[in-house]
Amino acid sequence: MAQSEDPEDFIAPAAHRVRPGTLLLANTDLLEPTFRRTVIYIVEHNSGGTLGVILNRPSETAVYNVLPQWAEVTAKPKTMFIGGPVKRDSALCLATLRVGMQADGVDGLRHVQGRVVMVDLDADPEELAPVIEGVRIFAGYSGWTTGQLDGEIERDDWIVLSALPSDVLIEPRIDLWGRVLRRQPLPMSLLATHPIDVSRN
């Protein structure tokens, strides 16, 4: 039987401002190793600041070695991801809901945007398994104080775009940075052809 499909899995609405559920793509001139060619999913954005996690920085640490109870529901490759440079000794978890499921009334889930939810790692993964497609667990996060991110966007460090639910659980063998750019209209999609090492071009 074919799996149900959700239109939002294929079409991301245009993003003009930062809000939960948007992506920050590192611009081609942002060469700082921590954030170079990163794709950051925004989890919180309010008057107190902004919090997000890097979606394309897998580590070599297996989830089973850190949070074994969550290994079964973790999306491949079932490793911890580096969410950012802040509080690397703490963990944050995102998941995508199965099509047709809702987070309302489900203990351990907090809605972020669309089918993306934040997961309480103290919850029982077996109880959440029927509701979610999978989880991604991040060590640390990326954070900005009030106004800090606005300044970085103004100097073109970041491109603000909308996310698809599939971006959260995408396998690291896929170039997420390039994939997100290629689904944008011209001329922005041409940025996906920017070489990783411009000195070799």
Curated annotation (Swiss-Prot):
Spans traversing the lipid bilayer: none
Cellular component terms (Gene Ontology): cytosol
Stored SUPFAM superfamilies: VC0467-like
Family: Belongs to the UPF0301 (AlgH) family.
The protein's name in its UniProt record: UPF0301 protein MSMEG_6921/MSMEI_6732
